[in-house]
Amino acid sequence: MMFKQYLQVTKPGIIFGNLISVIGGFLLASKGSIDYPLFIYTLVGVSLVVASGCVFNNFIDRDIDRKMERTKNRVLVKGLISPGVSLVYATLLGIAGFMLLWFGANPLACWLGVMGFVVYVGIYSLYMKRHSVYGTLIGSLSGAAPPVIGYCAVTGDFDSGAAILLAIFSLWQMPHSYAIAIFRLKDYQAANIPVLPVVKGISVAKNHITLYIIAFAVATLMLTLGGYAGYKYLVVAAAVSVWWLGMALRGYKVEDDKVWARKLFGFSIIAITALSIMMSVDFMVPNSQSLLTYVW
């Protein structure tokens, strides 16, 4: 029973979703030549770092989680794990994850993990989520870290391919998160969390969703235009982007925003999974200039 509680507090669904993107970035960079020990070290390392961040987030959010229907039964809210124990647990997970990335992958992968962790726990969870409508934007950077870590674990440098991945996954986070905020609007209002639909209204949020999906569509094309992914990837990227944009535009005519937002959220998961799969299997050898090389 205790194992289940310690697993739940790490948010395994979030870990699994991040692993899909890590695999996408790793295999894109590997280009068919897979270093399996490196692959395992990277997956486990990122999983532990994400788990650590989620436990810290649960610790920080336990007061507002009590006010939200979706989160009122979380482990820390119900007192099934003490706050002190959760902090020790989160710290140990983080140390293990960062050590695996440093020694099993490379220092750059580790530092990217540290940056993503600091943004999520230190900037987003501790401050921005509760105080700023821009919290979602800042949080999107940490959400985009895993595929970049996977990519840089292979390459050892931050090149234009890594930058494109950062853009794709950051831009994807925005409509994905705003959709959640719309169909969970009452929860966010009850907890006084200043997400865009609460502060500016659902109509403004719909405009932002549409614009971010357009930007996401452009970013996805850059992997092919930059010589990193092939035309099969391009076709899938274009198809999911057009469909997702169409769903967003239909939101201006719907009567039930909650139902629409839930569908938009559901398709966002399909879209990013499809892209992660396609970049894993339809890769190309790029001609690129390194933006940041870590020599060790």
From Swiss-Prot:
Pfam families: UbiA. Keywords: Cell inner membrane, Cell membrane, Heme biosynthesis, Membrane, Transferase, Transmembrane, Transmembrane helix. Residues 1-9, 57-78, 127-197, 248-268 are cytoplasmic. It catalyses: heme b + (2E,6E)-farnesyl diphosphate + H2O = Fe(II)-heme o + diphosphate. CDD domains: PT_UbiA_Cox10 (cd13957). GO terms for cellular component: plasma membrane. It comes from the Bacteria. It is a multi-pass membrane protein. The chain crosses the membrane at residues 10-28, 38-56, 79-97, 108-126, 198-216, 229-247, 269-287. Residues 29-37, 98-107, 217-228, 288-296 are periplasmic. Belongs to the UbiA prenyltransferase family. Protoheme IX farnesyltransferase subfamily. This is Protoheme IX farnesyltransferase. It comes from Salmonella arizonae (strain ATCC BAA-731 / CDC346-86 / RSK2980). The lineage of its organism: Bacteria, Pseudomonadati, Pseudomonadota, Gammaproteobacteria, Enterobacterales. The gene is cyoE.
